[in-house]
Amino acid sequence: MPETPQNPMSRRDLLKTTSVATAGLLAGSATVRAKSERKKGTDPFRYCLNMSTIRGQDLSVTGEVDVAGKAGYDAIEPWLGKLNDYKKGGGSLKDLRRRIEDHGLTVESAIGFARWIVDDDKQRAKGIEEAKRDMDLLAQLGAKRIAAPPAGARGTVDPMAAAERYRKLLEIGAEIGVVPQIEMWGGNPSIGRVSTAIYIAIEAGHPDACFLGDVYHTYKGGSDFEGLKMLGPQALQHFHWNDYPADPPLDKIGDGDRVYPGDGIAPITDIVKGFLQVGAVPVLSLELFNKKY
């Protein structure tokens, strides 16, 4: 099927994914085949579309949902900015939820940038309120989780202070029914490595604490993928799925250089095998920012 502006993701059928049967990356109609493999009991993973991947198409929220549904995805990961604009413009969250469910999709996670982690008390209070509003909105869509990145943090935030703040976020999420996932951004001075994110999650001391991982950010932050094998199903519930090329080098690579899984040099097969070794089957969410796509 040719790629067109109306069908922007058809070029690769949206996602190359891993099949347990072959223990490697497969090309072709990956999302459709993945569902078929799951029915046969050979692929335990579910596949999600992070809406950053098609942001360049400038679709409406409903258009994004339709693209994900028609492509054969299991789930979506929308961005709060666009959801809030949809709501402010008179869009019905009830109707949007129905549209999502009619496509057989779930909202496994969402991307927000509330400043919950910052040291400034007033900014952090505003950030917590923003996070609460975001989670309230997501709950109306039946969403399960929300990203909790180190948004707004300037310089290093004490990890123990971050853990206390993350716990507060988790407590609010528990009341609403949406789980905040601690997210690391590779190279970020506050949460720039997998180990830092996991430290914060552990020290938060909350039963819902979990980790939102990312292939690119793990590499960018200088963490080794072997470290993921120390985690388990509780920590690894949702994972941003992408790859990175050999060039640009690590010190120059950016978000826009991410490529489809299997098109770069990341140890994709080993990462998936590592998940399975520890009994984790996180939802794999395709998150790209590559303008070439």
Annotate each predicted stretch with a short phrase:
Residues 1-9:
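N-terminal secretory signal peptides
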Residues 18-29, 35-42, 65-69, 99-106, ...:
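Active-site acidic/histidine proton-transfer and metal-coordination neighborhood
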Residues 75-76, 110, 167-265, 269-274:
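Acidic/histidine-rich catalytic cores of soluble enzymes
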Residues 63-81:
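Catalytic domains of carbohydrate-active enzymes, especially glycoside hydrolases
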Residues 40-59:
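Boundary/entry segment of secreted carbohydrate-active catalytic domains
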Residues 52-54, 79-81, 112-115, 151-153, ...:
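Active-site beta-loop-alpha junctions enriched in small/polar residues
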Residues 77-100, 150-153:
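Glycine-rich, proline-tolerant flexible connector loops at the mouths of alpha/beta enzymes
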Residues 49, 68, 76, 100, ...:
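Conserved, mostly hydrophobic/aromatic
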